[in-house]
């Protein structure tokens, strides 16, 4: 009996052992087969080849951004065509040079060839603030009321930057100079050649030059208020320009400036033949001002015929040669604004016309209370 039980237990245990071995063996065997990787070696090189192929494709995409000399690659920056002609030439010259060192050497060349500024003009008023080196800029009108600049610096490199601006801006009318935005510095591609402080110095020079041009324009308007008739140039201020740099004109302290600017009338009885009906540009100007300013009084007078000797005569600038206008606007929109800011508002509204052949405006901008 005991033997039978013993054999039974043994048999039972013997049956369990093979079962357990079989169980673990069956579990372990597939694990061993999973460790066999007959396909892995062939797959890995294929995967790596895919990565290499992708890298080669991405490498081919890199060159277009480096071809930054193309104006179209600058996106929303100010178009080169809006810059003064000489400044356009300089920008294109720098864009054609890929090596930063070559651009640096060109600046040095400009600096060495810049005519020194007379010491009497190296004053605090002419000094550019925020530059690493000392820089002075002087501005004055030539006989045709174009701005002429002179500059100097105690650093050859900074002198080169000043010379670049003097060369690019001199001989141009005030509106062209004031339309320039800081974008032109990006178009030059000098970021790799100059330190951040030098780049900021270049922009500070531009701001002072624009400020001086605006001062000349305002002074010219003050002189014209003496009663002498003279050609009036428009004042346009770029949006990127800091308002802190724009001189304010107190209307109360200078009433004659508002009263006499561009108010010369044409006597219909004596000069009826000179009265010009508004053409397409004149009508657009009138409609724009009526819509945006809701004026109490609005006069738009085409005086382009008075400037027959000007570069833009009738028929040469599109819109039947409509290039010069007298504007008289009485509107509540001018309330609390200085003369300069009133001009700025008007020219912001007429930007499309300014870009398409409008050369000059004589503006009288008043509030109803000032009439």
Curated annotation (Swiss-Prot):
Keywords in alphabetical order: Chloroplast, Glutathionylation, Mitochondrion, Plastid, Transit peptide
UniProt-listed Pfam families: BolA (PF01722), SufE (PF02657)
Subcellular location per the Swiss-Prot or TrEMBL entry: Plastid, Chloroplast stroma; Mitochondrion
Keyword Plastid carried by entry: yes
GO cellular component: chloroplast; chloroplast stroma; cytosol; mitochondrion
Residue numbers of S-glutathionyl cysteine PTMs: 131
GO biological processes: embryo development ending in seed dormancy
Additional remarks: Over-expression of SUFE1 leads to retarded growth and chlorosis.
Protein name in UniProt: SufE-like protein 1, chloroplastic/mitochondrial
Native source species: Arabidopsis thaliana
UniProt lineage: Eukaryota, Viridiplantae, Streptophyta, Embryophyta, Tracheophyta
């Amino acid at each position: 009996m005991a033997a039978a039980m013993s054999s039974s237990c043994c048999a039972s245990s013997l049956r369990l052992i093979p079962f357990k071995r079989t169980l673990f063996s069956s579990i372990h065997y597939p694990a061993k087969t999973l460790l066999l990787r007959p396909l892995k070696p062939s797959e890995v090189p294929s995967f790596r080849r895919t990565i290499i192929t992708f890298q080669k494709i991405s490498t081919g995409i890199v060159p277009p951004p480096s071809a930054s000399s193309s104006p179209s690659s600058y996106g929303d920056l100010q178009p080169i065509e809006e810059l003064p002609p000489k400044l356009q030439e300089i920008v294109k010259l720098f864009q054609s040079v890929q090596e930063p060192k070559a651009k640096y050497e060109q600046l040095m060349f400009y600096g060495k060839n810049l005519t020194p500024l007379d010491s009497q003009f190296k004053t605090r008023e002419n000094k550019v603030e925020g530059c690493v080196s000392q820089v002075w800029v002087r501005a004055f009108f030539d006989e045709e009321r174009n701005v002429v600049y002179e500059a100097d610096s105690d650093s050859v490199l900074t002198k080169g930057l000043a010379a670049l601006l003097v060369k690019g801006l001199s001989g141009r009318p005030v509106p062209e100079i004031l339309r320039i935005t800081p974008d032109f510095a990006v178009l030059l591609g000098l970021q790799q050649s100059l330190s951040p402080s030098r780049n900021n110095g270049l922009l500070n020079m531009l701001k002072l030059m624009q400020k001086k041009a605006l001062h000349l324009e305002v002074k010219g308007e003050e002189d014209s208020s003496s009663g002498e008739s003279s050609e009036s140039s428009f004042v346009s201020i770029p949006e990127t320009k800091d308002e802190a740099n724009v001189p304010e004109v107190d209307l109360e302290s200078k009433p004659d400036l508002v009263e006499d600017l561009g108010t010369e009338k044409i006597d219909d009885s004596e000069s009826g033949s000179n009265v010009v009906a508004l053409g397409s540009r004149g009508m657009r100007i009138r409609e724009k001002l009526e819509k945006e300013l809701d004026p109490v009084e609005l006069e738009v007078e085409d005086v382009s015929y008075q400037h027959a000797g000007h570069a833009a005569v009738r028929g040469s600038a599109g819109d039947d040669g409509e290039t010069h206008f007298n504007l008289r606007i009485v509107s509540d929109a001018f309330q609390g604004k200085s003369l300069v800011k009133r001009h700025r508002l008007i020219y912001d509204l007429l930007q499309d016309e300014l870009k398409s052949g409008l050369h000059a405006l004589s503006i009288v901008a008043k509030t109803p209370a000032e009439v």
